[in-house]
Amino acid sequence: MKPLFIISCPIDTYSGYGSRSRDLVKAIIELDKYDIKILPQRWGGTPWGFIQDNPEWKFLEKHILPNGQIPRQPEIWAQVTIPNEFQPVGKYNIGFTAGIETTVCNPTWIDGMNRMNLNIVSSKHSKDVFLNAKFEEKNQQTNQIVRHIKLEKPVEVLFEGVDLNIYKLLDKLPQNELFDSINSIPESFAYLYLGHWLQGDIGEDRKNVGLLIKAFYETFKNKKQKPALFLKTSILAGASYVDREEVIKKIKQIKKTVNSKDLPNIYLLHGEFSDIEINEIYNHPKIKAMISLTKGEGFGRPLLEFTQCKKPVITTGWSGHVDFL
């Protein structure tokens, strides 16, 4: 009888953590050493339904626990989430996290990692931040130090990687509606940004989408020859009409802050795309480079995906993505 290995993760979501979860679970299933069961979790407001929409992942369905019920204490328990949510449910417990996008983490994250037997992060940046984190907890009445908080459990880096059967340089370009819509723009040179548009005003959101748009307008305003910028993004983490209108509204708000009527074009790619469609976007001849002004990434999966089509990546030189860029 194989050891029971239960993995709690956002397996069915359209998210970076969802992609990480699917890759991880697939790899463990292929070891054929464990009885793998999946406990699906949500990931913020990101939409569900990835497995249903992508038949090549349907094999995961037979591993999903019915009604979310854990049959017994597993020999191995793993969670793919942020560390403050880690709980030791199994006889041996593993926490998987992309980690941290800054230089300092919350002490509750260290507490969560200390509850596990092993912690696995996506980048050297994340590992270093956790190893260097040290805090003092004080009594609020006496101001006396009641405990020192530091990482006491092992932490290792497991590189996320990409599926080279999907993300690759295409020998033959597709002929479909998506390809034709990108082809229809008048510009011959376009940048691409791919990622969520997180909370905050211009310069405040972590992935810096607002500042990217502002900088793009300011850099190429009044130029005779202007490139385009494609944004594959969402704000409410969905593919709804409401979300699309919210993205368009924010772009227009930023556009109004630029002192010119002669501005470059920004095009929005909105909705749910398959991995194959994303790779087709990467390979489109009008897409010349990926750009991201991100303030920090635990890993930065789209940046790695894009490198496989042999085009330049323009981004900040700090945090998780410098492991591979």
Residue ranges and their predicted role:
Residues G300-L303, W318:
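Short glycine/serine-rich donor-binding loops of glycosyltransferases
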Residues I6-S8, G45-V129:
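Extended catalytic core of nucleotide-activated donor transferases of GT-like folds
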Residues L293-K295:
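Aromatic "clamp/platform" in nucleotide-sugar-dependent glycosyltransferases that forms part
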Residues R20-R22, A27, L164-E280:
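Conserved catalytic-core segment of nucleotide-activated headgroup transferases in glycan assembly
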Residues L118-E177:
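Donor nucleotide-sugar binding/catalytic pocket of nucleotide-sugar-dependent glycosyltransferases
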Residues P312-T315:
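Short hydrophobic beta-strand element within catalytic cores of glycosyltransferases
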Residues S274-K288, Q308:
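Short acidic alpha-helix that forms the nucleotide-activated donor recognition element
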Residues M1-P74, A228:
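N-terminal pre-catalytic "stem/leader" segment of glycosyltransferase-like enzymes
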